[in-house]
């Protein structure tokens, strides 16, 4: 393994203040940069490289690697897919590339500034229906190392093309009957007639459950109609991105979200 990755830390509040002052002073929008994934051959040697590899493993195989913190069958890669063995590297599917330079940031859900560590904790509590890792947990540090490696070369505050999940909203209620027909035709083969997903030979979810006790809970971002519709529109069916119309993605999301799932127990600002 070769390459050099320097990790700099600063006070979260100070970093956010400096970023805000810089943006106001220049009176311009943050720059947009291309989504570029580092070559695996450029992983650094030594302890940092080992931490990056562990972080990738935690994000790819989360239930098996961190069973005490995951309450369902989902792994981080199910909402943050990647290619060539990476996680969080695909556009329009909340990629991790550049994410370290966009935190701390204001969270409308919490009504305050939060760190990336806290945002990851949200995902564990909501999307994984589990509990957040302590801020000094070794696995969390490894995940941050992986995200930092993916983000190398991206300026602080820059917007990476394809960041986040583009939301999709139509000015009508979802058509559940149409959504069910589309689900049976385009989704059932992978996710099952009962939405329970498909396991591989090792008992891990090759295709995740979309509802039921092993799926994300009611506090997850994917439980929002606009977010689910946007994800389906841009990333589903697998291998046929953007093959559904806006109307089709909207109705499939509406059908999926009518089904029961674990209840998020904490107060939410969603």
Swiss-Prot record:
Example GO molecular function: metal ion binding
Main location: periplasm
Gene Ontology annotations for the cellular component aspect, listed alphabetically: periplasmic space
The organism of origin for this protein: Allochromatium vinosum (strain ATCC 17899 / DSM 180 / NBRC 103801 / NCIMB 10441 / D)
Pfam families tied to this protein: Cytochrome_CBB3 (PF13442), SoxA-TsdA_cyt-c (PF21342)
Binding site for heme c 1: 76, 79-80
Keywords: Heme, Iron, Metal-binding, Oxidoreductase, Periplasm, Repeat, Signal
Cytochrome c domain sequence ranges: 44-158, 174-260
PANTHER family hit by this protein: BLL4482 PROTEIN-RELATED, CYTOCHROME C DOMAIN-CONTAINING PROTEIN
Superkingdom of the organism of origin: Bacteria
Subcellular location: Periplasm
Positions annotated to bind heme c 2: 187, 190-191
Post-translational modification: Binds 2 heme c groups covalently per subunit.
Protein name: Thiosulfate dehydrogenase
Catalysis: reaction(s): 2 thiosulfate + 2 Fe(III)-[cytochrome c] = tetrathionate + 2 Fe(II)-[cytochrome c] + 2 H(+)
Catalytic activity, EC: 1.8.2.2
Influence of pH: Optimum pH is 4.2.
Assembly and binders: Monomer.
Signal peptide location: 1-27
Cited InterPro entries: Cyt_c-like_dom, Cyt_c-like_dom_sf, Cytochrome_c-type_DH
Disruption phenotype: Cells are unable to produce tetrathionate from thiosulfate.
Function: Catalyzes the oxidation of 2 molecules of thiosulfate to tetrathionate.
């Amino acid at each position: 393994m070769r390459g050099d990755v320097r990790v700099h830390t600063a006070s979260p509040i100070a970093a956010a203040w400096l970023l805000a002052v810089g943006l106001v002073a220049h009176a311009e929008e943050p720059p947009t940069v291309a989504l570029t994934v580092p070559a695996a051959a450029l992983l650094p040697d030594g302890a940092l490289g080992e931490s990056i590899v562990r972080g990738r493993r935690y994000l790819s195989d989360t239930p098996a690697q961190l069973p005490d913190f995951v309450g369902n069958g989902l792994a981080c890669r199910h909402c943050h897919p990647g290619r060539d063995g990476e996680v969080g590297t695909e556009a329009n599917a909340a990629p991790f590339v550049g994410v370290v330079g966009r935190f701390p940031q204001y969270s409308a859900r919490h009504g305050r500034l939060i760190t990336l560590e806290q945002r990851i904790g949200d995902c564990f509590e909501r999307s994984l229906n589990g509990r957040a890792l302590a801020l000094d947990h070794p696995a969390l540090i490894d995940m941050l190392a992986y995200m930092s490696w993916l983000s190398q070369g991206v300026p602080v505050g820059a917007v990476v093309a394809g960041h986040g999940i583009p939301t999709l909203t139509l000015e009508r209620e979802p058509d559940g009957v149409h959504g069910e027909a589309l689900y049976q035709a385009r989704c059932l083969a992978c996710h099952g007639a009962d939405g329970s997903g498909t396991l591989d030979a090792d008992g891990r979810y090759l295709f995740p459950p979309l509802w039921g006790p092993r799926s994300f809970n009611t506090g997850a971002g994917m439980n929002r109609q606009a977010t689910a519709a946007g994800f389906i529109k841009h990333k589903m069916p697998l291998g046929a991105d953007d093959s559904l119309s806006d109307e089709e993605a909207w109705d499939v999301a509406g059908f999926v979200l009518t089904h029961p799932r674990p209840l998020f127990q904490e107060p939410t600002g969603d």
